[in-house]
Amino acid sequence: MNYQVLLYYKYMTIDDPEQFAQDHLAFCKAHHLKGRILVSTEGINGTLSGTKEETEQYMAHMHADERFKDMVFKIDEAEGHAFKKMHVRPRKEIVALDLEDDVDPRHTTGQYLSPVEFRKALEDDDTVIIDARNDYEFDLGHFRGAIRPNITRFRDLPDWIKENKALFADKKVVTYCTGGIRCEKFSGWLLKEGFEDVAQLHGGIATYGKDPETKGEYWDGKMYVFDDRISVDINQVEKTIIGKDWFDGKPCERYINCANPECNKQILVSEENETKYLGACSYECAKHERNRYVQANNISDNEWQQRLTNFDDLHQHA
């Protein structure tokens, strides 16, 4: 495989995010890179793809900058680009938690746990493990015994914690996310909320899966990623599928977006059921006049109406 996907972040000061974004986009395009990078006054958060040569040049370029000289890159091999375009966007935050009283992870953040230390925490009955990702990420794969917050956006996590505080009272709390960036800020927020014993998986699931000692042990399913790959394997010890098809509940790890552009809900669904239910999550979405599956597959009105009858006897799970 001649391509690589890079995942990285760093909390540090960028004085002029707008100018930085403009210059950085030009550099990335000149090196034929594709991906998504967010920059703000609090730092940088990026994931991009390119050939090995181009991504190595990018990392060398970043490490040559005093501000990014110690930035850690998580690297996956790939068969081609994981993105279709290149975006570098200035933002208020590099992860959107939208707190009234913001947290600076450079000053307030949970204790860092190495993959081996995190594995011990997973084995400790007195430790609560919180998945800091969204529900659809959790449903594709997660650490065994982890708590699933019922959220679809990271910014909703603090409210969910407040509503369920009894679950974590007087417990050691350990949190994890994809690459570590969300936990840097979330664990700091937990400390400010009065939780005393707070830790985080340093480098996230991506680092844990590549660790030569842990080898992704205790991870079930796949890890959701925000690029064209959709998911990657983590557990090198044993393979399990925990995802369930939206319609029939059978084991499934195939995510699609609902074909109704006004819904766009992410659902796990087999190719067979995608065809059967017109790429939609519900009858209402399947019959939507702008159904993308119907348009992309040139389905006739008669065939459309015929397939809609597949919903008649369907009892969807929640």
UniProtKB/Swiss-Prot annotation:
The active site is at C177. NCBIfam families: PRK00142.1-3 (NF001135). Belongs to the TrhO family. Its EC number is 1.14.-.-. Keywords: Oxidoreductase, tRNA processing. SMART domains: RHOD. Catalyzes oxygen-dependent 5-hydroxyuridine (ho5U) modification at position 34 in tRNAs. The keyword Oxidoreductase applies. This is tRNA uridine(34) hydroxylase. GO terms for biological process: tRNA modification. Transmembrane segments: none annotated. It holds the Pfam family Rhodanese. GO terms for molecular function: oxidoreductase activity, acting on paired donors, with incorporation or reduction of molecular oxygen. SUPFAM superfamilies: Rhodanese/Cell cycle control phosphatase (SSF52821). It is an enzyme of class 1 (oxidoreductase). It comes from Staphylococcus aureus (strain NCTC 8325 / PS 47). InterPro entries: Rhodanese-like_dom, Rhodanese-like_dom_sf, Rhodanese_C, TrhO, TRHO_N. It catalyses: uridine(34) in tRNA + AH2 + O2 = 5-hydroxyuridine(34) in tRNA + A + H2O. HAMAP family: TrhO.
